[in-house]
Amino acid sequence: MLELIYKMQPLDYVYLLVGIILFIFAIQSFLNKDHKYRIGTGLFWLLYSVSFIFGSYLSKEINGWLVIAMAAIVLVKQLGKGHYFESPIEFKKGEAVRIGNIIFIPALLVGIITFIIGFFTKLGALVGLGIAAIIAMGAALYITKGSFNQGFHEGRRLIDAIGWTAILSQLLAALGYLFNLAGVGKIISSAVASVVPADNVFLVVVAYCIGMVIFTMIMGNAFAAFAMITSAIGVPMLVVAHGANPAAIGAIAMLAGYCGTLMTPMAANFNIVPVALLEMRDQYGVIKAQLPIALIMLVLNILLMYYFI
């Protein structure tokens, strides 16, 4: 076991740390007797922790079954919120006044330290994020005079509020990989070519931008959509056929994809997680607020791309 730890890469240590934290959340859920869904919730986070700690050593089939088991827990509605030993509202208000704006220092440290490590070292941004999170945690404990135990309870409260959407980013990344293996890009290219006249630049631009929006909404990730839609429409039908500037249309296509991000629950980190953290009544309140701006920006992106052709 120790030999395996010594051979681990820096990023593996970050995954190990995340897995240990998720394991602690699982144990806390199992021990929370006031939690109506403590077995299902604890099992969900336990399976998730296993994927982080042992995922590299397990077969693809076993990792796949772990995901299916987690999905089954959500399907039968056994994932829910519990009791988190929160401080009284009066105490929170008093601490907010006492600490003031200094409370934002840990959050700022995460971004600053991640940037420094990612930009000036060879460790990479993800490793930098892990190191930054540890330092920020220490700063938060020093500023608030809280305890590690309290920190884990708050962490569990937040992860339970986020719920199943916490695993959505990984699932969407896998979906993008499967789409590429299945040759979806070629299918899209053939379908668009059969409907949109190749000599009509404006219609090709519309197809490119709307394609970015639709696939971003499906996959929840503009980067994954970009690889497929650009190889299917952007490169052959705009760059090759009409001599478009690849840098310009690529940048604008990403902006069009972000319009899709504003309109989909699949972009959970942006549109669903804030709803859970802010305890909004309308599950799609964030999306509804962003929808008009997204549509306006989409039209502007189409016109801007057409201008650069």
Language model features: what each stretch is:
Residues 11-31, 37-88:
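Transmembrane-helix bundle segments that line or gate the permeation/cavity pathway
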Residues 18-32, 257-309:
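Juxtamembrane and boundary regions of transmembrane helices in multi-pass small-molecule transporters
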Residues 64, 124-133, 150-184:
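Core transmembrane alpha-helical segments of multi-pass membrane transporters/permeases
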Residues 164, 177-184, 216-229, 259-268:
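Short helix-coil transition sites and intra-membrane helix breaks within transmembrane domains
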Residues 196-236:
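Hydrophobic alpha-helical transmembrane segments of multi-pass integral membrane proteins
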Residues 201-202, 242-250, 279-292:
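Membrane-interface alpha-helices at helix entry/exit sites of multi-pass transporters
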Residues 202-215, 242-263:
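Alpha-helical transmembrane segments of multi-pass membrane proteins
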Residues 224-237, 267-279:
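Re-entrant/interfacial helical elements at transmembrane boundaries that shape
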